[in-house]
Amino acid sequence: MKQYDIEKDIRYLQLLSQSFPTIAEASTEIINLKAILNLPKGTEHFLADIHGEYEAFLHVLKNASGNIKRKVNELFGTTLREQEKRDLCSLIYYPEQKLELVKNNEKDIDDWYHITLHRLVAVCRDVSSKYTRSKVRKSLPCDFSYIIQELLHEHTEDHDKTAYVNVIVDTIISTGRADDFIIAIANVIQRLAIDQLHILGDIYDRGPGAHIILDKMRRYHSWDIQWGNHDVLWMGAAAGNDACICNVIRLSLRYANLSTLEEGYGINLIPLATFAMETYNDDPCTEFLPKLSGGAASLDDKTTRLTAQMHKAIAVIQFKIEGQLIEKHPEWKMDGRRLFEHINYGKGTVEIDGKEYEMSSCNFPTIDPKYPNRLSEEETILIQKLHHSFKVCEKLHKHIRVMLQHGCMYAIFNNNLLFHASCPLNADGSLKEVEIYPGHKYSGRNLMHYTGMQIRTAFQQDSDPAEKEYAIDYFLYLWCGPDSPLFDKSKMATFERYFVADKETHKEEKGYYFLLRDNEEVIDHIMDEFGVTGPNRHIINGHVPVRTLKGENPIKANGKLMVIDGGFSKAYHNETGIAGYTLVYHSRGFQLVQHEPFTSTEDAIKLGTDIKSTTQIVEMSNRRMLVADTDIGKDLYKQVEDLKELLYAYRHGYIKEKETKKM
């Protein structure tokens, strides 16, 4: 028998004995934990770069990246017609809306209820089969918890049990509870189909519904996020960084997607519109015409013109404020980005990296060439109003708190290292030191950790005022700084893309991480630094769209690195050739699911259309992975060992059992 140092652990064991006051209860818990360790591991889903495309994202959650459709095919492949299977899937994804359609068209609704309830129970039984009854029970709505448990655990091979199940189903229908039951069990199926959701950054920008996505995530059962550069930009805006506020508004105007700003967060853009119309009334603002896609494609000429004027107005203010912040922080080494100071306003040229370029336009009525980064009086008043709107927006701050609660710069789950973009490297593949606070340089894991701490400093009430001010300023560096782990490029060529036709200036040199990440040794070195161990370890990233049309492969470094930005954003569909990836990690291994564009929620409900997805097997295990093989399994093993030590303490008289009252 194993010997324990009871005296050393006695205080902890006494606390543990309060939860398990008898030998019998401690033994029962050991049995339960051992049983859980031998269940198949739960299914993890990895998504990245959602960029406000809420309809496609929510549909992927509802269909579990095609997993529910696959299970319906396995269960009813030869017994149901294709349309019936599509309708069943559609009912699981959108129960409330689908029920309305069915009730308008179905002649014998009670018969439909009876058949459908049995089918839904069969699907629910299948998706819940890898979980303990306790975990399933916790996922059930209170109203139907007992009934669903009875239906899931009664097998209809027995004639008496069949009658029992039929009576339950008939009673659900006869009491008028069929609709509520269908909605409840459909939501349970959705919930159990995804055990853990990992979002590798960039919920915000480009698409119209980041606020809708975050409303969903506030209520989602189990998820985490590794912040992306666009998420951090919105965090900076919420914290009061005026450069971030300008960038957020500029990007929304660039894609003519103001839904998140105006409808989601109630940000008042009327002062900006008024200022832009007055200031740029005679300016065609050609370079600032919005990129139109999706719902924004139908903008009329008048709205498009106003959007371009607002776009230019906020861009000019942004470049001025960025210039001020860069001057305030010479340690960022970004002086070359103070480009308003390098314009020859008489000639209409700009000097970039020592070379003079002609500008496509040079109409800047609010710029004083002597003090080009100084805001005009009207611009100052405008930015104060916008700053106030962001600072007092309760819903925005609620969403940022959700991202802080569930998020971090990096995470390690089951031997997989997750981060959005980059781990800065030197040319030789060694980890690069980056200064994130004057005099404080970090690399690798420490860089990610302390960057995350810096972000949190900006939102903590008890932060040192000087540190908090720096943390708020630093959001701009995280967005576009050359050594930022969320950017890692030589520059962000926003100014050049607007004002310089020569495309040589648009080039953004990628950092060494992006150049070396196909090298297996480099990837192994990074994983070693982060303490990621095991024979099947990986890095998973988003950030850089995988251009499948050009033959790019999301699997790199001999399978050790996976890049899963497949272009959820409609703006990138033509570049990537697809509409996003989901990486699925289940008990049999990794599968990469490639999605085609989603038509609409309305089509999914009315026509039963689904996202067409193709699955690529990335890595299959030679045996089924169990809970014992996961991070949760390691914790459960520790709990088992602690309970064994408690049993030893009971049996050797170190701790006395306590009598428990019998119910």
Feature roles, as predicted:
Residues 1-663:
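Feature recognizes metal-dependent phosphohydrolase scaffolds
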